[in-house]
UniProtKB/Swiss-Prot annotation:
Keywords: Hydrolase, Magnesium, Metal-binding. Its EC number is 3.1.2.30. This is (3S)-malyl-CoA thioesterase. PANTHER family: CITRATE LYASE SUBUNIT BETA, LYASE BETA SUBUNIT, PUTATIVE (AFU_ORTHOLOGUE AFUA_4G13030)-RELATED. It comes from Cereibacter sphaeroides (strain ATCC 17025 / ATH 2.4.3) (Rhodobacter sphaeroides). Substrate binds at R70, E122. Homodimer or homotrimer. SUPFAM superfamilies: Phosphoenolpyruvate/pyruvate domain. It comes from the Bacteria. Its cofactor is Mg(2+).
């Protein structure tokens, strides 16, 4: 979204079966939390995790953090019951795993009419159908599942994420075309701060709203990288001031630091300031 009322710089996965982790998450500096009932939960823990998470969301105080529940797929024995369990709950979003077509979104939309839906984009077919998926009227966000996508592609890890570039780009284009939030995939080496920072910067520069994270130790870097810097805020203010001054003199462009500033640059500048304001408001809550 161009002007989000809520930041999604850091989106932390928490296993729905881990009571201590659910409790600890109330005090973490995450913009949003994905409470995971899918990959992070063993088969024999699925029902327990669902019940525990439902009760936890009713009683725990997660503040203004967006509460996202990743349910099991509708082709599993748990998926439909997962969705039913969080209808009318305090979940802000239902995250649908392994979305390959808009039909997968509709299958969940039919079960839960009043909760926003996000799609995990993690299959090869999902990449090819990204525009169709993003166009679904109930969808408000996408999450890149880069581990599963790499598995399907049989690709190897590279710091430049060469094999994933096409998929990342297709989903980003689809999300922006339809006004969706879109969050980058995880960085697995949670002790590698330099690698995490580089991948966050790559995702930020591509245009992602934030990054999914697997460990609380990754929060600080993600929050920093996906926040406008003081220099970016200062430049945005100067661009807006210069452009408004130019308009008062009947001119359609301004010059700031030797560079032309047109209306499109002002749109970006206002987006930068809006994001900074949203982050400040979130931090003050």
């Amino acid at each position: 979204m161009a002007h989000q009322a809520h930041p999604f710089r850091s989106v932390l996965y928490i296993p729905g079966s881990k009571e201590r982790a659910l409790e600890k998450a109330q005090g973490l500096a995450a913009d949003a939390i994905i409470f995971d009932l899918e990959d992070a939960v063993a088969h024999d823990e699925k029902i327990h995790a669902r019940d525990l998470l439902r009760k936890t969301l009713e009683t725990a105080d997660y503040g203004r953090r967006i509460r996202i529940v990743r349910v099991n797929g509708m082709d599993t024995e748990w998926g439909r019951d997962d969705v039913a369990a969080f209808a009318g709950s305090k979940a802000d979003v239902i995250l649908i795993p392994k979305v390959s077509s808009a039909t997968d979104v509709q299958a969940v939309a039919d079960l839960i009419p009043d909760v926003p839906l996000w799609a995990m984009m993690e299959t090869a077919l999902g990449m090819l159908n990204a525009a169709e998926i993003a166009a679904h009227p109930r969808l408000t966000g996408m999450v890149m599942g880069t581990n599963d996508l790499a598995k399907e592609l049989t690709s190897r890890f590279r710091p430049d994420r060469l094999a994933l570039q096409t998929g990342l780009g297709l989903c980003l284009l689809a999300a922006r075309a339809h006004g969706l939030t879109i969050v980058d995939g995880v960085y697995n080496a949670f002790k590698d701060e330099d690698g995490l920072r580089a991948e966050c910067e790559h995702g930020r520069d591509m245009g992602f709203d934030g990054k999914t994270l697997i460990h609380p130790a990754q929060l600080e870097i993600a929050n920093e990288v996906f926040s406008p810097s003081s220099a970016e805020i200062e430049l945005a203010n100067r661009q807006i001031a210069a452009f408004e001054e130019a308009e008062r003199h009947g001119q359609g462009v301004a010059v700031v630091d030797g560079k032309i500033v047109e209306n499109l640059h002002i749109v970006t500048a206002r987006q930068t300031l809006a994001k900074a304001e949203a982050i400040a408001a979130f931090g003050a809550s």
